[in-house]
Amino acid sequence: MLDLGWSEILVIAVVLIVVVGPKDLPRVLRSFGRTTAKMRAMAGDFRRQFDEALREAELDDMKGLVDDVRKLDPRSEIRKHLSPLEEAGKEIRSGLSEAAKAKPAASSLPAADSKPAEPLKNGATSLGPEAPPPVTGETAAPKVSEKAEVGAVAASPGTSAKQAAPKAKAAAAAKAPTKNTASAPAKKPSPRRKKTAGTAP
């Protein structure tokens, strides 16, 4: 507290004896001792109150930390960090389902437009060169989709190049234009002649 050496204490004692006098010196020393004790007690109380306030503040901080730990739910934290991954997964799934829906719809359109082949008539072995049917908006669209479907069959990810070629040829053969019965004029059957008994053919 005060750095007083023996020589300094001796100087203070001599000054007190001279100033106060030998008669009143014991009473002054007692009052000085009491005052010093009171000041020490007050300093101790202040220190205790200050330490107590610090402990309460630390306890409040500790209580806050304990409450935070109790409120901490690791599952919610993990969900919060994984939610972007879930959203990305949902986007991928929706994209795949849309692609899967689009592929069957594209392959079903050319199948609906195909027409059955006309059987050969009168023992003919092949169809002769005839003029192709007139191209309209309805017949032009299947040809474009036929090429797209042949390309899709050839480029499907599950087939190799050797497997894709026969599939493409088979698809092209199945979609080949056939003779349209509605475009050719219908032949009228020749009228039958009545046979009479008196005429020779």
Curated annotation (Swiss-Prot):
InterPro entries: TatA/B/E, TatB. It is a single-pass membrane protein. Coiled coil: none annotated. It is found in: Cell inner membrane. GO terms for cellular component: TAT protein transport complex. Keywords: Cell inner membrane, Cell membrane, Membrane, Protein transport, Translocation, Transmembrane, Transmembrane helix, Transport. Its main location: membrane. Part of the twin-arginine translocation (Tat) system that transports large folded proteins containing a characteristic twin-arginine motif in their signal peptide across membranes. Together with TatC, TatB is part of a receptor directly interacting with Tat signal peptides. TatB may form an oligomeric binding site that transiently accommodates folded Tat precursor proteins before their translocation. This is Sec-independent protein translocase protein TatB. The gene is tatB.
